[in-house]
């Protein structure tokens, strides 16, 4: 609450049409439900007071279900971005994502069915990824018609599954030049 209040005070002199309170940098709906409610209750108060116009979050496809969507709807969430990463099953498997492409399609459909704005995040350079898989994923994302689409290069973070694969010599991250060219 204090962080949001402090940040909001810096915006008073700006002429901004839409101010969003966003929960990024992780899988929001993967945290315990009570913690989600605690964060969202603060965001909802800001929205109801008119200080913000939208509540925005990112999560994983396998952290979407009807209970979660009902909760997000109750707290007036507007935008859900899914870290889809890839629509190619071999890439999801090699990256140890823990879900299949059916889960991705189902989650996207449910989010749209509930009336949320859908964002799809794709990631290039994951294990087993190829130019062809990237094009396939981009086309599949376009077929779903998300309102937001983001494309990220893979960044390996210490103490993750990708980091372990890299340490074992089983995965080599894409270099900056290749990421830009792709």
Can you name each region flagged by the protein language model?
Residues 24-27, 152:
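Glycine-rich beta-strand-to-loop/alpha-helix junction loops that act as flexible
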Residues 33, 40, 44-47, 56, ...:
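C-terminal scaffold of the Radical SAM
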């Amino acid at each position: 609450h204090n962080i949001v209040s402090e940040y909001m005070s810096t915006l008073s002199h700006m002429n901004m049409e839409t101010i969003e309170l966003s929960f990024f940098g992780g899988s929001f709906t993967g945290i315990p439900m009570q913690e989600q409610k605690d964060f969202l209750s603060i965001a909802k108060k800001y929205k109801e007071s008119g200080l913000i116009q939208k509540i925005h979050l990112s999560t994983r496809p396998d952290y979407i279900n009807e209970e979660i969507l009902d909760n997000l709807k109750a707290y007036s969430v507007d935008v859900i971005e899914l870290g889809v990463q890839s629509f190619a099953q071999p890439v999801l498997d090699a990256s140890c994502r823990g879900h299949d492409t059916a889960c991705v399609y189902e989650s996207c459909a449910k989010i749209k069915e509930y009336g949320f704005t859908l964002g799809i995040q794709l990631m290039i350079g994951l294990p087993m990824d190829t130019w062809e898989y990237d094009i396939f994923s981009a086309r599949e994302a376009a077929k779903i018609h998300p309102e937001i689409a983001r494309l990220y290069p893979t960044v390996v973070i210490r103490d993750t599954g990708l980091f372990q694969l890299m340490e074992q010599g089983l995965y080599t991250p894409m270099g900056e030049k290749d990421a830009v060219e792709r």
